[in-house]
């Protein structure tokens, strides 16, 4: 692992066009849920840099404002929070109208509760330049409208979404969002990475071990654990006699541990007495080399075996972690190729313009 002091010194020297270690992302998740007979829809907006939530807005709060969710954001001035609060409130009002509009598109009654979600963001490549952008809408937990990888056109999932697609095309919304994603979003992501570099650019290797859980006299479950790692991207695989064993592997989603790190496990059912034929392989950018684990009986500690896999080099590679958000709908995106960017005005909202009408 790269020495922490050296990493900080290198970070100080980084300019906007210089190389960051690995890729990084800035994403916003906005969710609105209608509440028939109970007033305005509930609206929540959260922002993430890589795997770290750094801002949040909730219109059910006693005093609804965009607030910091990461220590490195607490020193931002009132101008920033006023601007981001206005942007969130504007988006909440547009969502209120959009929920009513979509209910009409689908011929739904006013009695039911419905959910509208909007995710948008940008990603930097290892060279610190724009790599891809994404924007997606979902209605009642299902994809609705997606900005295509070229950031110039939309994909609608049904006839109702085609109405929104046509309205977006008429208003040149794709062009507006492309400008935000390629310019303003990138500039803010650089700023956040600089402000939170001690947290966002650090590597925390996983603590690994294997546990044994008898099922019957004939079978047992081997569970491979990875705990306390950052960033969230990690690979856990089981092998039998050196060959991949994925068909019967149970793999859980990477989960936040509550302390800024993540945890994950992968399990496989094996015949009793054949446990030593199975190995768990762990890959994470915080590890200098992949780790191979075998289960050891209780009388012996679990001993990690450093596995040197030919052609696999992890040193110096940092992969952007998966965004873990408390939202109903989430979809993985991939997009276009990188390019240069122009400097955006800091007066622009980090969230971009408010959501457009559907």
UniProtKB/Swiss-Prot annotation:
Effect in UniProt of substituting residue 110 to A: Has no impact on the affinity for KLRD1-KLRC1
Topology relative to the membrane: Single-pass type I membrane protein
Primary location recorded for the protein, binned into one broad class: membrane
Keyword entries, A-Z: Adaptive immunity, Cell membrane, Disulfide bond, Glycoprotein, Golgi apparatus, Host-virus interaction, Immunity, Innate immunity, Membrane, MHC I, Phosphoprotein, Secreted, Signal, Transmembrane, Transmembrane helix
Effect of residue 167 to A: Impairs folding
Recorded GO MF terms: beta-2-microglobulin binding; MHC class I protein binding; natural killer cell lectin-like receptor binding; peptide antigen binding; receptor ligand activity; signaling receptor binding; T cell receptor binding
Tissues/organs with expression: Expressed in secretory endometrial cells during pregnancy (at protein level). The expression in nonlymphoid tissues is restricted to endothelial cells from all types of vessels, including arteries, veins, capillaries, and lymphatics (at protein level). In lymphoid organs, it is mainly expressed in endothelial venules, B and T cells, monocytes, macrophages, NK cells and megakaryocytes (at protein level).
Chain positions covered by the region annotation Alpha-1: 22-111
Post-translational note: N-glycosylated.
Location in the cell: Cell membrane; Golgi apparatus membrane
Region span, Disordered: 333-358
Side Extracellular, residues: 22-305
Binding sites annotated in the UniProt record for a peptide antigen 1: 28, 84, 87, 98, 105, 164, 167, 180, 192
Residues that hold a peptide antigen 2 according to the record: 98, 105, 164, 167, 177, 180, 192
UniProt topological domain (Cytoplasmic) ranges: 330-358
Region (Alpha-3): 204-295
Record-level GO BP terms: adaptive immune response; antibacterial humoral response; antigen processing and presentation of endogenous peptide antigen via MHC class I via ER pathway, TAP-independent; antigen processing and presentation of endogenous peptide antigen via MHC class Ib; antigen processing and presentation of exogenous peptide antigen via MHC class Ib; CD8-positive, alpha-beta T cell activation; defense response to Gram-positive bacterium; immune response
Segments of this protein annotated with the region Connecting peptide: 296-305
Signal peptide: 1-21
Outcome, altering residue 96 to A: Abolishes the recognition by KLRD1-KLRC1
UniProt KW Cell inner membrane keyword: no
Residues modified as Phosphoserine: 353
Family: Belongs to the MHC class I family.
Subunit structure: Forms a heterotrimer with B2M and a self- or a pathogen-derived peptide (peptide-bound HLA-E-B2M). Similarly to MHC class Ia assembly, HLA-E-B2M heterodimer interacts with components of the antigen processing machinery TAPBP and TAP1-TAP2 complex; this interaction is required for peptide loading and translocation to the cell surface. Interacts with CALCR; this interaction is required for appropriate folding. The optimum binding peptide is a nonamer (VL9) that is primarily derived from amino-acid residues 3-11 of the signal sequences of most HLA-A, -B, -C and -G molecules.
Name of the molecule in the record: HLA class I histocompatibility antigen, alpha chain E
Originating organism: Homo sapiens (Human)
Gene label: HLA-E
């Amino acid at each position: 692992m790269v020495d922490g002091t050296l990493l900080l010194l290198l970070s100080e020297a980084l300019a906007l066009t210089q190389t960051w270690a690995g890729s990084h992302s800035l994403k916003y998740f906005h969710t609105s849920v209608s509440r028939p007979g109970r007033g305005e829809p509930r609206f929540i907006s959260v922002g993430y840099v890589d795997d770290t939530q750094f801002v949040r807005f909730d219109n059910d709060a006693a005093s609804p404002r965009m607030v910091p969710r990461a220590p490195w954001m607490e020193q931002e001035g009132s101008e920033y929070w006023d601007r981001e609060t206005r942007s969130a409130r504007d988006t909440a009002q547009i969502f209120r109208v959009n929920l009513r509009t979509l209910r009409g598109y689908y011929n739904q009654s006013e009695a039911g509760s419905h959910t509208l979600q909007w995710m948008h963001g940008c990603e930097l490549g290892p060279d610190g330049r724009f790599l891809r952008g994404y924007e997606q809408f979902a209605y009642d937990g299902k994809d609705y409208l997606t900005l295509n990888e070229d950031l110039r056109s939309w994909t609608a999932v049904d006839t109702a979404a085609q109405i929104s697609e046509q309205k977006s095309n008429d208003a040149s919304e794709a062009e507006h969002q492309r400008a935000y994603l390629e310019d303003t979003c990138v500039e803010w992501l650089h700023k956040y990475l600089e402000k939170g570099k001690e947290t966002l650019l650090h590597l925390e290797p996983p603590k690994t071990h294997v546990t044994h859980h008898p099922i019957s006299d004939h079978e047992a479950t081997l569970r491979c654990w990875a705990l306390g790692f950052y960033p969230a991207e990690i690979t856990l695989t089981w092998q039998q006699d050196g060959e991949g064993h994925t068909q019967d592997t149970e793999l859980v989603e990477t989960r936040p541990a509550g302390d800024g790190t993540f945890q994950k496990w992968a399990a496989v059912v094996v015949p009793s007495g054949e446990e030593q034929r199975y190995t768990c392989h762990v890959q994470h950018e915080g590890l200098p080399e992949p780790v191979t684990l075998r289960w050891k009986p209780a009388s012996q500690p679990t001993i990690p075996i450093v596995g040197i896999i030919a052609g696999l080099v992890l040193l110096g590679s940092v992969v952007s972690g998966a965004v873990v958000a408390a939202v109903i709908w989430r979809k993985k995106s991939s997009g276009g190729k990188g390019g240069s960017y122009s400097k955006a005005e800091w007066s622009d909202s980090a969230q971009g313009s408010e959501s457009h009408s559907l």
